[in-house]
């Protein structure tokens, strides 16, 4: 039986490939749909209507309009770090 971490890894891989399809990368539209479906709270809290455009620009280091799996993981890691920072601050406030 997979551990929670193994399940989390599998979920990230499956999510990327579900939105990337056979082409094995995300386009800006793929990324927008993924963000809307998988990170709805993040997008709802963004004040900038161009948030997905800016994220795509940051992730698309080759400037070819494609986001590969490693860049997708960078996005997920950044979001996890931000969530952890928020969590730590709020845990300290509860003490």
From Swiss-Prot:
Gene Ontology molecular functions: calcium ion binding; calcium-dependent protein binding; protein homodimerization activity; transmembrane transporter binding
UniProt keyword Acetylation, yes or no: yes
An annotated GO cellular component: membrane raft
Induction of its expression: By nerve growth factor.
Keywords: Acetylation
Superkingdom, natural source: Eukaryota
One GO biological process term: positive regulation of stress fiber assembly
Modified residues (N6-acetyllysine): 23, 28, 54, 57
Residues of the EF-hand domain: 47-82
InterPro entries membership: EF-hand-dom_pair, EF_hand_dom, S100/CaBP7/8-like_CS, S100_Ca-bd_sub
Region ranges (Ancestral calcium site): 60-71
Function according to Swiss-Prot or TrEMBL: Because S100A10 induces the dimerization of ANXA2/p36, it may function as a regulator of protein phosphorylation in that the ANXA2 monomer is the preferred target (in vitro) of tyrosine-specific kinase.
Note: Does not appear to bind calcium. Contains 2 ancestral calcium site related to EF-hand domains that have lost their ability to bind calcium.
Subunit record text: Heterotetramer containing 2 light chains of S100A10/p11 and 2 heavy chains of ANXA2/p36. Interacts with SCN10A. Interacts with TASOR.
Protein name: Protein S100-A10
Native species: Rattus norvegicus (Rat)
Species lineage: Eukaryota, Metazoa, Chordata, Craniata, Vertebrata
Gene transcribed to yield this protein: S100a10
């Amino acid at each position: 039986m997979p551990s929670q971490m193994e399940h989390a890894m599998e979920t990230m891989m499956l999510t990327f490939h579900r939105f990337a399809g056979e082409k094995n990368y995300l386009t800006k539209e793929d990324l927008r749909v993924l963000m809307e479906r998988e990170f709805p709270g993040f997008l709802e809290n963004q004040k900038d209507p161009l948030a997905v455009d800016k994220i795509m620009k940051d992730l698309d280091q080759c400037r070819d309009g494609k986001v590969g799996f490693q860049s997708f993981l960078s996005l997920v890691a950044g979001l996890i770090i931000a969530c952890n920072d928020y969590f730590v601050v709020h845990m300290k406030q509860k003490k």
